[in-house]
Amino acid sequence: MKYILLGLLLMVVLANANRLADPNCGVCTLRSICFMEKESCPKGFKMLCF
């Protein structure tokens, strides 16, 4: 259980670091309405659109 939580925390940190590098890149969240792929985003990251 501890390792699962650490993994989730690491994913959040990496996602936020990526978002700082390119504000248009983000990861899927339950709050988001839709997602669009963006070529400049690293693989697995998507552009947030609200």
Curated annotation (Swiss-Prot):
Its main location: secreted. Expressed by the venom gland. GO terms for cellular component: extracellular region. Contains 2 disulfide bonds. Residues 1-17 form the signal peptide. The keyword Endoplasmic reticulum does not apply. Belongs to the scutigerotoxin-02 family. Disulfide bonds: none annotated. It is found in: Secreted. The lineage of its organism: Eukaryota, Metazoa, Ecdysozoa, Arthropoda, Myriapoda. The keyword Disulfide bond applies. GO terms for molecular function: toxin activity. Keywords: Disulfide bond, Secreted, Signal, Toxin. This is U-scutigerotoxin(02)-Tl3a.
